Amino acid sequence: MLTLDTLNVMLAVSEEGLIEEMIIALLASPQLAVFFEKFPRLKAAITDDVPRWREALRSRLKDARVPPELTEEVMCYQQSQLLSTPQFIVQLPQILDLLHRLNSPWAEQARQLVDANSTITSALHTLFLQRWRLSLIVQATTLNQQLLEEEREQLLSEVQERMTLSGQLEPILADNNTAAGRLWDMSAGQLKRGDYQLIVKYGEFLNEQPELKRLAEQLGRSREAKSIPRNDAQMETFRTMVREPATVPEQVDGLQQSDDILRLLPPELATLGITELEYEFYRRLVEKQLLTYRLHGESWREKMIERPVVHKDYDEQPRGPFIVCVDTSGSMGGFNEQCAKAFCLALMRIALAENRRCYIMLFSTEIVRYELSGPQGIEQAIRFLSQQFRGGTDLASCFRAIMERLQSREWFDADAVVISDFIAQRLPDDVTSKVKELQRIHQHRFHAVAMSAHGKPGIMRIFDHIWRFDTGMRSRLLRRWRR
């Protein structure tokens, strides 16, 4: 069967002009005009999509099939061109019958032209073919326009859906023109209104927590600040958290003599049940001579020191992707879960604005992965935000997954971010040593976003930066009061 592209070539019909007219009409439609006025950042993104539309329309016209009636008429026209005038006179009745049978727009005019002239001359033969060709060109142009109109309606419907989605998410995820362009590209997926409303919900929550949003922005630009001390700088008071040894239930270190009843050795406790040794037990208790487990750990305390005022020179450095590990244990549920998800949404916003990648890993008893900056980023973000935090805590597996990804060529300059309350078991020595090796040799940086003030210092000391956001009730009330 004849294709429309072949027909256009045969009749010298310019499909490019028809495509350009259709695209101009689409961009000038009232729906797009209102949208461009409301969201100017997305205007450039949609305009950049025009070449793709043009190519899709060309492909549609190229693959379209010509109706059988028009195909038969074109074949008859081509055969008639090869006839001499005497041969044409002989074939003319069959040609007129064929045009009538095919309901050709040229049929009635052709018969009138023949009836108006008693003799078929060479000039009339040429005129007949010229007008027939014009009729075929009109039919081919009409067919092109019909197909383009169908495509225009379909394209307008698709663009309106994407405009609705992008318009809802633009205030949340698009910080500049780069982010707006990437957001428009990601809006091509099949999403329903109820799906992306989850992103809107967490975006609103993030706006209600400006400290959390500010923390994400500081983490995102932390590579560009370079401190330059001055000899004549004034002194300022600086508060810092320091580690110091403490007896906390973190790790059993050995045995000691004390009066700690809660950590008695079983043999000591057994003497309490023997009447002859009961007084001996109490004597050793008073003298702190009972054998107990010795605990070793570290705690944090606030220390005030004075230091010179530091002036910062912002020297732009290359910024790599984010690899974000999120703790989904039961202790991270509730408000912690909301904060962790909103923080990841803020990092996604930064990644879109700075053309970086944002890779999320959820760790509990297994690792679940999402890439929020890819072509399916919105769908991945919705799946991530739909997850519930009810698992256990396997921080070691999280670090192993991070280190495995950092060894890949495309992630060599990534920043690793771990979001947790850090109430977990101590990390194995092999994991700790590998992290230190990555920090020392490859300059990889590990960030901790601590959602609790009770995180274990033994775990957190391996991080380059610790960003604290206490989600306890007291801290939440203080933040609300300050606002």
Curated annotation (Swiss-Prot):
Q: Do you know which SUPFAM superfamilies this protein is assigned to?
A: vWA-like (SSF53300)
Q: Which GO terms describe its cellular component?
A: cytosol
Name the domain of life.
Bacteria
Pfam family for this entry, one: VWA_CoxE
Q: Where are the transmembrane segments?
A: none
Q: Does the keyword ATP-binding apply?
A: no
The answer to whether keyword Cytoplasm applies is: yes
> Keywords in UniProt for this one?
Chaperone, Cytoplasm
InterPro entries in UniProt: Uncharacterised_CoxE, Uncharacterised_ViaA, VWF_A, vWFA_dom_sf
List locations, semicolon-separated.
Cytoplasm
Q: Which Gene3D superfamilies match?
A: von Willebrand factor, type A domain
- Assembly information from the UniProt record: Homodimer. Interacts with RavA.
Q: Which NCBIfam families match?
A: PRK10997.1 (NF008230)
Q: What does this protein do?
A: Component of the RavA-ViaA chaperone complex, which may act on the membrane to optimize the function of some of the respiratory chains. ViaA stimulates the ATPase activity of RavA.
Which family, according to UniProt? Belongs to the ViaA family.
Output this protein's name. Regulatory protein ViaA
Say which species the protein is native to. Answer: Escherichia coli O6:K15:H31 (strain 536 / UPEC)
